[in-house]
Design a protein with these regions (language model features):
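A cytosolic small-molecule/anion-sensing beta-strand core signal
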Residues: 75-76
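Double-stranded beta-helix
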Residues: 6-10, 87, 112-145
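Short beta-strand His + acidic residue motifs that chelate non-heme Fe in jelly-roll/DSBH
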Residues: 63-64, 81-82, 105, 110-118, ...
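Short acidic-glycine-tyrosine-enriched beta hairpin
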Residues: 86-107
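A short, N-terminal "cap"/entry segment at the start of jelly-roll beta-barrel domains
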Residues: 1-53, 61, 141-145
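Conserved short histidine dyad/triad with adjacent acidic residue
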Residues: 47-71, 87, 107
């Protein structure tokens, strides 16, 4: 019987560049026609964590269920966040997040983002463990090791 081994990560750094998201293509969330968001992978993409930089824009509500633990740090913009916590989704809440806010979405949380600001709701998503979202690496960090 073999014993699993620890997969060690590498040190990575990313400096949040507005131009990375400003130049990214508009994407649409699955199952939410008319939704619009932008996302880039920061290059921090290891077995234990994936960090993406995202914009959600005013319009359609974004409804999602996270399959991993996720911490988000808001860089700019403002959004109302409604959450429903597992296991039965009975425990719920609604908050407003804005620049400087940081929050945890525990694994299994159903979340609804409603962007309130005219500017995008720009945020860093730190996902544990790495969910493997197929997001292209930020232009400013393509050559980083």
């Amino acid at each position: 019987m073999s014993v699993g081994h620890i997969e060690w990560g590498k040190f990575k750094i990313y400096h949040c560049e507005d131009s990375d998201l400003d130049g990214a293509p508009n994407l649409e969330f699955p199952f939410i026609p008319g939704s619009k968001f932008k996302a880039v992978n920061t290059g921090i993409d290891e077995a234990g964590v994936q960090v993406n930089y995202e914009d959600f824009v005013k319009g359609e509500d974004i409804v999602w269920t996270v399959s991993h633990d996720e911490v988000q740090y808001v860089v700019s913009g403002e959004a109302e966040i409604e959450y429903h916590l597992p296991p039965l989704m009975i425990e719920t809440g609604k908050v407003v997040a804005k620049a400087g806010s940081v929050y945890l979405l525990p694994r299994g949380t159903r979340v609804v983002w409603r962007v309130l600001s005219d500017e995008p709701f720009r945020h860093l998503c730190i996902c544990f463990p790495n969910p493997g979202y197929p997001i292209p690496v930020a232009e400013s960090n393509k050559d980083a090791g």
